Amino acid sequence: MSTKLQDHFEKITKILSGFGVEGCISYGEITFSIRDQRDIHLILKKLKKEYLFEQLTDVTAVDYLTYGQSDWQVGKVVSQTGFSRGRQQDFKTAAVDNRFEIIYQLLSMANNVRIRVKCKLKDAQIILVDSVSDLWPSANWAEREVYDMFGIYFNNHPDLRRVLTDYGFVGHPLRKDFPQTGYVEMRYDENLGRVVYEPVEIDDRVNTPRVIRN
């Protein structure tokens, strides 16, 4: 482990000592986990001010709805080749605590260090996080993308609209319960002179490769 990296870790840990934050160094990267999502804005503001993290390079999220589950029935063999058949999972869209995690990537050019700050979100039905677009302008579009893809809302965001999907799009494509085929497909209708939407005609199927471990 780099001595400089350890030094940065200890200094940042001291700055955040008054908050519910856990930190670690893994694979040469510093990561801090915030326990309470209500503290996100305050902690990030403190990091920017006191350790000069002047750049927010990315905001993203992870959906852990199917974490640890498999699309393959490995318990029993149903074919002569030794492979089980892929199956479609039935997802329950009810609230699941800690289903979503939000991740911030920060850069301090003054201290020449990058860190990752993440937080598990407690309520999966009303997912609300304070926007940090007032701290870093780069968060504006990044938070819009997270909202568009995952359905996470950002309180006090100046313009929280979809940024990648079409107007009137239903659902959030990077959620694990969103079908891979989507709900509708679009094509240009020459008779109508416009784009029309139609239900998808593609059958949803498992396309996760079967991994065999010795």
From Swiss-Prot:
Record-linked InterPro entries: NADH_DH_suC, NADH_quin_OxRdtase_su_C/D-like, NADH_UbQ_OxRdtase_30kDa_su, NADH_UbQ_OxRdtase_CS
Q: Name one Pfam family in it.
A: Complex1_30kDa
Q: Give the highest taxon in the source lineage.
A: Bacteria
Q: What does the UniProt keyword field contain?
A: Cell inner membrane, Cell membrane, Membrane, NAD, Quinone, Translocase, Transport, Ubiquinone
- A GO CC term? plasma membrane
Matching PROSITE patterns, A to Z? COMPLEX1_30K
- EC number(s)? 7.1.1.-
- Which reaction(s) does its UniProt entry say it catalyses? a quinone + NADH + 5 H(+)(in) = a quinol + NAD(+) + 4 H(+)(out)
Write down the membrane topology: Peripheral membrane protein
Q: Which Gene Ontology molecular-function terms are recorded?
A: NADH dehydrogenase (ubiquinone) activity; NADH:ubiquinone reductase (non-electrogenic) activity; quinone binding
Cellular compartments annotated: Cell inner membrane
Give the EC class as a word.
translocase
Q: Does the keyword Phosphoprotein apply?
A: no
Major location (coarse) = membrane
The family note in this entry says: Belongs to the complex I 30 kDa subunit family.
Quaternary structure, per UniProt, is: NDH-1 is composed of 14 different subunits. Subunits NuoB, C, D, E, F, and G constitute the peripheral sector of the complex.
Protein role: NDH-1 shuttles electrons from NADH, via FMN and iron-sulfur (Fe-S) centers, to quinones in the respiratory chain. The immediate electron acceptor for the enzyme in this species is believed to be ubiquinone. Couples the redox reaction to proton translocation (for every two electrons transferred, four hydrogen ions are translocated across the cytoplasmic membrane), and thus conserves the redox energy in a proton gradient.
Question: Sorted alphabetically, which NCBIfam families does this protein's record hold?
Answer: NuoC_fam, PRK06074.1-1
| Name the UniProt record assigns to this protein | NADH-quinone oxidoreductase subunit C
- Organism (species): Francisella tularensis subsp. holarctica (strain LVS)
